[in-house]
């Protein structure tokens, strides 16, 4: 019996959240084409052979002077020291400089490399990228190309991870998919809908708080608040005659329905908190951890 923790590490938009959902065969982590979508660590639990692999989806590694972004990167780096194995995730189109920066981080755990989005590249491009990493073959244990869309090489990756998990009893019930509670997942799904429906800088000055969840026999009622930092962004989120907030609600319900069998009643309000994304204590307490 084996059990251990694996941290998913990589730049923003490398495909870490998509990879986690793929490994779980279930959507628990928000996915967006926008950078820095993942703001808090989410644990996903995968059973493979006689092992339990607990994957930690971390915020992407990036450079920024903003308080929120700095704390996100700190959370990602901290997870490196807490894990048995690291999985560096990079798109086949990513510059290898990102991997060099990763190697400069202090780490004791072994690591694998997952090269994602190979379905979008030619065989020539894939082989060229794999060859780039061979310069550092003494650093990593294995490099695995992956396609989430085509569902390719999943078991090869899990077999490699299995080799490096420590002998240990399971940390969680094998039936669990995640350590996140429903509110945390709902919050991420609503935020994903915000990212889908509004553009530019609005999502980066926005977060979501799930105020209340009421479970009834045939319906789940979710009451949430979108928090933003100024009147202009609030107006954009609501939209003319409330059309944007309505669209956010429709999209969020669709995403939440991938997880729940019940009907969904979702009530979303929008409020302003000018300091939410610059106050370190607020971020740590309510959003990041």
Swiss-Prot record:
Residues 57-60 are annotated as: G3. Gene3D superfamilies: 3.30.300.20, P-loop containing nucleotide triphosphate hydrolases (3.40.50.300). GO terms for biological process: ribosomal small subunit assembly. Residues 36-40 are annotated as: G2. Residues 146-148 are annotated as: G5. GTP binds at residues 10-17, 57-61, 116-119. Residues 10-17 are annotated as: G1. SUPFAM superfamilies: P-loop containing nucleoside triphosphate hydrolases (SSF52540), Prokaryotic type KH domain (KH-domain type II) (SSF54814). Transmembrane segments: none annotated. It is a peripheral membrane protein. Its main location: cytoplasm. It is found in: Cytoplasm; Cell inner membrane. One of its GO terms (molecular function) is small ribosomal subunit rRNA binding. Keywords: Cell inner membrane, Cell membrane, Cytoplasm, GTP-binding, Membrane, Nucleotide-binding, Ribosome biogenesis, RNA-binding, rRNA-binding. Residues 116-119 are annotated as: G4. Residues 2-167 form the Era-type G domain. One of its GO terms (cellular component) is plasma membrane. The keyword Ribonucleoprotein does not apply. Monomer. An essential GTPase that binds both GDP and GTP, with rapid nucleotide exchange. Plays a role in 16S rRNA processing and 30S ribosomal subunit biogenesis and possibly also in cell cycle regulation and energy metabolism. Belongs to the TRAFAC class TrmE-Era-EngA-EngB-Septin-like GTPase superfamily. Era GTPase family. This is GTPase Era.
């Amino acid at each position: 019996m084996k059990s251990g923790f694996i941290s998913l590490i990589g730049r923003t938009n490398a495909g870490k959240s998509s990879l986690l959902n793929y490994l779980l065969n279930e959507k628990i982590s928000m996915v967006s084409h926008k950078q820095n979508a993942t703001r808090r660590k989410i644990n996903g639990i995968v059973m493979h052979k006689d092992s339990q692999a607990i994957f930690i989806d971390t915020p992407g590694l990036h450079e920024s002077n903003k308080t929120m972004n700095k704390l996100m990167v700190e959370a990602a780096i901290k997870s490196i020291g807490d894990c048995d194995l690291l999985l560096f995730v990079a798109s086949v189109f990513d510059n290898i400089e990102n991997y060099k920066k990763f190697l400069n981080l202090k780490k004791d755990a072994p690591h694998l490399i997952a090269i994602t989005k190979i379905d979008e590249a030619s065989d020539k491009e894939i082989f060229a990228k794999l060859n780039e990493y061979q310069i550092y073959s003494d650093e990593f244990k294995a490099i695995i190309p992956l396609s989430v869309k085509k569902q390719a090489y999943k078991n090869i990756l899990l077999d490699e991870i299995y080799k490096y998990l420590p002998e240990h009893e399971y940390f969680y019930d094998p039936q669990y998919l995640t350590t996140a509670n429903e509110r945390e997942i709902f919050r991420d799904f609503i935020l994903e809908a915000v990212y889908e429906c509004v553009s530019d800088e609005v999502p980066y000055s926005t977060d979501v708080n799930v105020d209340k969840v009421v479970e009834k026999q045939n319906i789940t009622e979710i009451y949430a608040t979108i928090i933003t930092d100024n009147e202009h962004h609030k107006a954009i989120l609501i939209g003319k005659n409330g059309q944007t907030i309505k669209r956010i609600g429709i999209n969020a319900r669709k995403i939440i329905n991938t997880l729940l069998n019940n009907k969904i009643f979702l009530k979303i309000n929008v409020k302003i908190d000018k300091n939410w994304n610059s106050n370190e204590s607020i971020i740590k307490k309510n959003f990041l951890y």
